[in-house]
Amino acid sequence: MARMTAEARRAELVQAAFRVMSREGVGAGTTRAICAEAGMVLATFHYCFRSRDELLRELMIMLSLKERVAATEAMKPGSDMRELLRQASYGYLEHLEEDPGHELVLFELNHYALRSPELRDLADEQYRRYYESATQILEGAAQLADVSWSVELPALARIVVAMIDGLTTTWLVDRDSDRSKEVIDMLSEYVSSKAVPN
């Protein structure tokens, strides 16, 4: 059997952390549990990561990237702004439906970080990434639809993040995708009203 590189071990430990936390919650993601899930000895963890916090940061980055990809890949050239926003949000909703554990882990990581002074910056970083993703999606949609934004993009991105956060939480509770699509349609209508033709 081929020897794993340090990078491959890191990636496997991050995936193992996700599996454990998705099944049992962030609190269950101890270094021991993660190593057991990955089929590695504890010393391997300390060889690959300086701390559990470093692994949590990498996990958060990986999960946030998957959300962005789900939204951006759903946007189709030739659509108007409202439709592009619907497509991106529906792409995210499909991602949520397919893997609710993904979002539960992100929410738990955020709450865990907010209660841990040494991890407070992790919560800040998570939302910086959300705002960056929303901004990039809005910029990409504006390019595809050949429009400009009539309001400051950081404020609009913040509105989108707040609405998607709320949509995610309510969907995790009630699993009502039809209602979530109604919210997406209203959000898309509102946000697209802030676009003006070039």
Question: What residues fall within each predicted segment?
Answer:
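All-alpha amphipathic helical-bundle segments outside canonical DNA-binding/catalytic cores
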Residues: 121-126, 143-159
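C-terminal peripheral helix-coil segments that are non-catalytic and often amphipathic
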Residues: 131-140, 163, 169-198
